[in-house]
């Protein structure tokens, strides 16, 4: 979602999450319209809270329903995509989600995979790879997506 303020640049906000399973793997999705593997997520719609948006996007893109609170990681500048774009990033533990039972493969999502964060596939996006490395190595995250 982009908020346009009179005479100012728009502020855009999105959400993504690292959804974990019992084996410690992380869910990634491949979209039909862009290259690479991403954490599931998307834009915050007008009237939504960030967490409400995250829940909606996880259901739409990954067939995942939140049953507990996601854990806040941080907000990251995604200026490489758009000057005022920011991504709110969360983790969702295995105990805090369930399957919706609906397969989201179709118009928007072409593939869903579970990957070991220590050895992600070669075609994860740069921002996804940065977050995976931070999950594995710990420490303070970078400020850029």
Placement of each model-derived feature along the sequence:
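Acidic, metal-coordinating catalytic segment for phosphate/diphosphate chemistry
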Residues: 1-16
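Short, well-ordered beta-strand micro-motif
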Residues: 19, 89-93, 113-116
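Conserved Nudix-box catalytic region and its N-terminal flanking loop in Nudix hydrolases
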Residues: 21, 25-61
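Nudix hydrolase/Nudix homology domain
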Residues: 36, 106-145
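A short coil-to-beta-strand element that immediately follows conserved catalytic motifs
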Residues: 65-74
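Active-site-adjacent beta-strand/loop module that shapes the phosphate/pyrophosphate-binding cleft
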Residues: 76-101, 131, 135
């Amino acid at each position: 979602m982009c908020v346009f303020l009179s005479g100012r640049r728009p502020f855009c906000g999105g959400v993504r999450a690292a959804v974990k399973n019992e084996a410690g793997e992380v869910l990634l999705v491949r979209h039909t319209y862009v290259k690479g593997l991403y954490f599931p997520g998307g834009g915050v719609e007008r009237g939504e809270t960030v967490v409400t948006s995250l829940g909606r996007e996880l259901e739409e893109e990954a067939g995942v329903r939140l049953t507990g609170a996601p854990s806040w990681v941080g907000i990251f500048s995604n200026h490489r995509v758009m000057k005022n774009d920011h991504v709110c990033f969360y983790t969702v533990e295995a105990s805090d989600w369930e399957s919706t039972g609906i397969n989201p493969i179709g118009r928007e999502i072409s593939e869903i995979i579970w990957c070991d964060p220590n050895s992600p596939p070669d075609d994860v996006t740069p921002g996804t790879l940065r977050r995976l490395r931070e999950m594995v190595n710990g420490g303070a995250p970078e400020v850029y997506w």
